[in-house]
A protein has these predicted regions:
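Short, acidic/polar
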Residues: 1, 60-70, 128-135, 204-219, ...
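Substrate-binding cleft and catalytic face of glycoside hydrolase catalytic domains
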Residues: 1-59, 216-312
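Aromatic- and acid-rich polysaccharide-binding/catalytic face
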Residues: 3-6, 12, 54-55, 62-101, ...
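Residues that flank catalytic or metal-binding motifs in active/ligand-binding sites
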Residues: 4, 47, 75, 141, ...
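A structural signal for well-ordered alpha-helical scaffolds and beta->alpha junctions
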Residues: 8, 31, 35, 60, ...
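Alpha-helical structural signal in soluble globular domains
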Residues: 37-45, 66-71, 75, 102-106, ...
Length: 312
């Protein structure tokens, strides 16, 4: 099955304990080896498919410099960053352009913002302000800008974070990042969402919200969608059927597909954020090549990286 893949993103937030337990890989050598191996396998089967380094959070110049020293940046076409200055980061919203410039200077690659957002935890008006200001600061500045997210997290679900204790009450901001409330009603920011921005929306295994999410994306006129497939889910019964269903539903959009989450059987420790053992690194590379072959055309509809135009 072929989907219009705009890019393949290798991992998510590799410098954040919620997604990569760097206490088990303190110099990120395991991450570098895994990413380079996956990039090589994807290049072998889909050489034209743009590869993006998983969005970093926090935005850390030193981390990008470290990965460059391992050859990771030579293996990808773009780097990505995440920022939530109104909710968790320790820098002001107005610093977005400076943050982008700092990473560009070190990476010598274009920078995507693969997650930017603001919660409605305190008030809907705060989220609306964050959307307006983020769009004003970054439209025309970056090739891709994905708003996180479309849907609020259902209150009965757990947020994907290992920082609950340190976050305190800020943990609950994770539940209010969407343009659409958990009950299906739109927030004020939804009515003003600029259709030229992308949206990042993650889906859980057999997520019942998939069809409603696609309906909202189409109503908003969104063209660019970032989502993910869980490597950990690849080994579950019915995984390929679910992956196919998810990707089939997203066919109307240009998709940046993120691959992330370690199967417990392949981790240094049995946790989705664990670095994989050496044999697991090869398995992730195999998963990445499988996803590229299954969901990307031989020559992507974007044609080449030259076709990637900044959002306006």
């Amino acid at each position: 099955m072929v989907v219009v893949l705009a890019a393949l993103m290798l991992w998510n937030e590799p410098n954040n304990l919620s997604h990569w337990n760097f206490a088990l890989d303190p110099e990120w050598r395991g991450f570098a080896a895994m990413t380079c191996a996956a990039a090589a396998r994807v290049r072998a089967v889909r050489p034209e498919l743009p590869l993006v380094l998983g969005g970093i959070s926090p935005i850390d110049v030193g981390f990008i410099r470290l990965l460059a020293s391992y050859g990771v940046l030579a293996a990808v076409d773009r780097v990505a960053v995440h920022g939530f200055p109104l909710d968790w980061n320790h820098w002001p919203l107005a610093d977005w352009p400076r943050k982008i410039a700092e990473i560009e200077q070190v990476a010598n690659l274009p920078v995507w913002v693969s997650e930017a957002g603001a919660s409605s935890f305190g008030a809907d008006e705060i989220q609306l302000f964050g959307l307006r200001a983020t769009a004003r600061l970054l439209r025309g500045r970056v090739e891709r800008l994905y708003w996180y997210s479309l849907l609020d997290l259902p209150p009965q679900w757990e947020a994907t974070t290992r920082h609950r204790e340190s976050e305190g009450s800020a943990y609950y901001r994770h539940y209010y990042m969407g343009l659409i409330r958990a009950d299906g009603t739109p927030k004020p920011a939804c009515a003003e969402f600029p259709r030229e921005l992308g949206i990042c929306q993650w889906f859980h295994f057999e997520d019942p919200r998939l069809e409603a999410a696609v309906d909202w994306l189409q109503r908003l006129g969104v063209q660019h969608v970032r989502t993910g497939l869980s490597w950990a889910d690849w080994y579950r019964p019915g995984a390929e059927a679910w992956f196919d269903r998810q990707m089939q539903a997203l066919r109307p959009f240009q998709v940046t597909l993120t691959l992330c989450y370690t199967p417990t059987a392949l981790g240094v420790e049995p946790h989705y954020a664990s670095p994989p053992r050496p044999e697991g690194q090869a398995e992730f590379a195999r998963f990445a090549a499988w996803a590229a072959q299954r969901y990307a055309p031989v020559a992507p509809a974007l044609g080449s990286l030259r076709a990637l135009e900044p959002v306006r």
